[in-house]
From Swiss-Prot:
Enzyme Commission identifier(s): 2.4.2.7
Domain of life: Bacteria
Protein name (database record): Adenine phosphoribosyltransferase
Family assignment from sequence similarity: Belongs to the purine/pyrimidine phosphoribosyltransferase family.
Gene that produces this protein: apt
Known partners and oligomeric status: Homodimer.
Amino acid sequence: MDLQTYIRSIPDFPKPGILFRDINPLLRNPAAMVEVMRRLGAICDAVQPDLIVGIESRGFIVGTPLALQRSLGFVPVRKPGKLPGAVIGVDYALEYGTDRLEIQSDALTGNPRVLVVDDLLATGGTAAATGSLVRAAGGELVGFAFVIELEPLGGRSALPDEVLAESLIRYP
């Protein structure tokens, strides 16, 4: 199945000059989602994680069913102030300014093997920050899995070389 046929390209969204890759048509198609889960499952099998970490918010959409499919736990990484209790956070650079991600401080006890899942790899800043956060929280980062990769933005170069990074759809 050619998953790219289920991705809609929307020019000038959210601002002029941006070509937005919309996964909503893919999410609406059960057969396409089954195929996404099959392919993400193969990546998961290759790295044998103990937990799936999903990045807010679309990482939740693909990470939770993957975790259920593989009988694994799911841990959300969220923006500041969204998680109850004690958290560990990491700040990371954006094009103009900084942002922050957080995880509950007890989410990765026991050094679990972690696969980070998200819908999109663009510049790699959010994914790299999540990888750092996983390590800071006590997890062993074993891989990244993305539905879409925008290759011209060079996000793969921001990720640790020693960790598997796979994308289901790549836009050159």
